Design a protein with these regions (language model features):
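An N-terminal assembly and electron-transfer interface module characteristic of large anaerobic redox
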Residues: 1-167
Length: 167
């Protein structure tokens, strides 16, 4: 919604832009309210293997918070150089209090959570429910609602069967 406010400033229509922001936020909270009966309290892990210049975790973490999901950990895959790892740790820490752990430390955790959101397919474990986070995220209110719906539907799938869903 930041872009709406910026557009309002550019067009000298701040009040109108703020009205649009409120409408968009109402849509997000209304949808989140519908699916929270399933998402609330569910345990998840976010696995990240992309550099910060290609993946910004803030939107994902904000959506998980809106759905009242419990982020057990952020797992950073082993493909980071020290500089890129530091940048991602700073970006994640600014948004989330969950522990940030490496791939090895997170292996067992993957099997105990309700959902794994990941930038890279985890192919060595077919039992976990995964949502693949694309390079280009869905945008806008409709994009976030589509992402929340994907989380909801993945959590609603019957049984313990894993698999991967592409947003």
């Amino acid at each position: 919604v930041g872009w709406l406010r910026n557009l309002g400033v550019f067009l000298h229509q701040e009040a109108l832009a703020e009205k649009a922001v409120v409408q968009e936020m109402d849509k997000l909270f209304a949808f989140a309210g519908k699916v929270k009966k399933i998402t609330q309290g569910k345990r998840c892990v976010v696995c990240i293997g992309r550099m910060l210049m290609y993946f910004h975790p803030a939107g994902i973490l904000e959506t998980l918070s809106r759905l009242e999901m419990q982020v057990e950990a952020i797992i950073l895959f082993d493909n980071y150089n020290p500089k890129e790892r530091k940048l991602m740790v700073e970006a994640v820490s600014a948004q989330c209090q969950a522990p940030i752990i490496d791939q090895t430390a997170g292996q067992q955790l993957l099997e105990t959570v309700d959902l794994v959101l990941t930038t890279h397919e985890i192919t060595n474990n077919q039992d976990i429910k995964q949502i693949f986070l694309p390079m280009l995220p869905l945008v806008g209110t409709s994009g976030e609602i589509e992402f929340m719906d994907c989380i909801y539907k993945t959590l609603c799938r019957r049984g313990e069967k894993g698999g991967i869903v592409y947003v």
